[in-house]
């Protein structure tokens, strides 16, 4: 099971996911393991490249509801983070710096999406944040994490103008690979 799970975590290609499903589907004797494997396959297929990114609702700092679908027509770069996450705090200024290089582009939005359970800690944390990144708090962090197959943060996601997943697990902004991946699709 662990080999199958690791194989799924290492690919976002729909064809490879289908191969993994075929390779492992009859190898589990325990019904709970089989069910867990099937759920992992379903999650991997939902997050495969080219799939429509699952819509979610979030709240901005004014308490207004925003949906992912409201950004159709723009590239969306998402930083999934929380106030209690040390690595998230480390990556945040680097994410902000990259967002700043694209600030003149009307067809790109950078979103810092908090998955904090308590919105009040998020409100305190974002009060001094730069305006180049839209600060949002996801309405249901558990549902969002399941939808996007997120088991750890920070996580960086790139969504295309038509709402399709381009990369559901971008490299960290502290690496050159982050900007290289963005430059394949975006123009500053």
Regions found by a protein language model. Give the residues of each.
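Oxidative protein folding and maturation machinery
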Residues: 1-66
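Conserved redox-active cysteine motifs that mediate thiol-disulfide chemistry
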Residues: 72-73, 80-97
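Conserved hydrophobic packing residues within short motifs/helices of P-loop NTPase cores
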Residues: 78, 111-113, 157
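Thiol-/selenol-based redox modules, centered on thioredoxin-like
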Residues: 161-188
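Alpha/beta-hydrolase fold active-site loops
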Residues: 75-76, 154
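Structural microenvironment flanking redox-active thiols in thiol-disulfide oxidoreductases
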Residues: 90-129, 140-146, 180
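Active-site acidic short loop of glycosyltransferases
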Residues: 72-74, 105, 131, 150
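Short, internal strand/loop/helix patches
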Residues: 59, 123-162
């Amino acid at each position: 099971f662990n080999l199958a799970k690791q194989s799924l975590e290492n690919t976002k290609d729909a064809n490879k996911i289908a191969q993994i499903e075929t390779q492992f589907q009859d190898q589990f004797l325990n019904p709970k393991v089989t069910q867990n494997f099937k759920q992992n396959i379903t999650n991997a297929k939902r997050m495969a490249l080219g799939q429509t990114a699952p819509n979610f609702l979030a709240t901005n700092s004014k308490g207004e509801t925003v949906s992912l679908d409201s950004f159709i027509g723009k590239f969306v770069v998402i930083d999934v983070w929380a106030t209690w996450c040390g690595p998230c705090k480390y990556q945040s200024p680097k994410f902000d710096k990259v967002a700043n290089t694209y600030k003149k582009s009307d067809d790109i939005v950078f979103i810092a999406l908090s998955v904090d359970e308590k919105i009040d800690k998020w409100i305190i944390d974002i009060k001094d944040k730069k305006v180049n990144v839209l600060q949002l708090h996801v309405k249901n962090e558990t549902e969002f994490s399941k939808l996007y197959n997120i088991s750890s943060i920070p996580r960086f996601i790139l969504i295309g103008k038509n709402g399709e997943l381009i990369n559901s697990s971008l490299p960290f902004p502290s690496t050159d690979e982050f900007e290289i991946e963005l430059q394949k699709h975006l123009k500053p």
